[in-house]
Amino acid sequence: EMIFHPYAFGESREDRISSIGSGFIIDERGFVVTNYHVIKNAEIIEIIMSDGRIFPARYVGSHERADIALLKIPSEDKFTPAFLGNSDEIEVGDWAIAVGSPYGLEKTFTVGVVSAKSREDLDETGQTHIQTDTAINPGSSGGPLLNIYGEVVGINRMIRSSSGASAGIGFAIPINYAKRVLRQIEQNVGQNIRPATLGVMATTPLPDHRKSLGIPNDAVGVLVYDIEPNSAAEKGGLRRYDFIEGANGLSVRHINDLREQVGLVGLGGVLRLKILRDTQEMELSIPLVEAAYQKGK
């Protein structure tokens, strides 16, 4: 367990603004995971270990939409990493343990249960979260959500509360999704992967749609029913009533699978789609553009 002190500087030392967040080590070489919003706009990041040691952190990269950042402790020491579990295996009612530094209170463990496995559409990103009634408060962000075996199943991210303090409705990023994001960050060292959009509306097709469009009953995917003008999808050749079967080599079983791949690729990346159009299988490579909710920010 560790605390982060990200500093943004004004014109003088007195203008220094600091914030506190949490994080955890994922590699014996000292690679550390936290939330992107914990270190956003920071010029200096300090890591305080549970044994009191303080290290300056080196920024490795981040993924803005996923709200994940990867840091490195600049030391030749070997560190003990957290064990990353399998968030697909959790069940509603399982014990959930949040570790962090709420309000700067170090080494705080709070206990609750998994309230929901795949809570969707909590914010503009559409990202899926684990919901828990485990107490998560300011300063807990970026810390691990553990199962009863001490395995990391999520990264504590945010709460739903009218007061700003825990009301028993907290949300964590599933660790399996985080693993995929971290691989993407490792391929874009030194960069912040910014949000992108495809610009389609899609849904699981009804039996009548399958029959009229020649989509096999056993085919898995989503049906495009509308495309935004001047979007990446339109410019990349995607059409209304295309049936999307895969994205970047992975099956698309639900619209959230497609959203996840768009998010992982990020702004400026290329999304490779496998589609069915008029009973013919095709592949499209679509350069992604900036997400509409990010424009002007």
Label for each model-derived stretch:
Residues E1, H37, W95, S101-P102, ...:
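Short, surface-exposed secondary-structure boundary micro-motifs
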Residues E1-V32, K40-E46, R53-I54, S75-D77, ...:
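Glycine-biased strand-turn-strand hairpin within the trypsin-fold
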Residues I3-R16, V60-A66, I73, K117-I130, ...:
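Gly/Ser-enriched beta-turn/beta-hairpin loop segments
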Residues R16-I17, A42-I45, F79, V99-V113, ...:
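Active-site loop architecture of trypsin-fold serine endopeptidases
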Residues S22, R58, K72, E91-D94, ...:
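C-terminal recognition in membrane/secretory proteostasis and scaffolding
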Residues I26-D27, I39-K40, L84, I90, ...:
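Short, well-ordered loop/turn sites that connect or cap secondary structure elements
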Residues I44-S50, A96-G100, G269-I275:
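Short conserved beta-strand and strand-loop elements enriched in small hydrophobics
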Residues I48, R58-V60, D77-L105, N137, ...:
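Active-site substrate-binding loop(s) of clan PA
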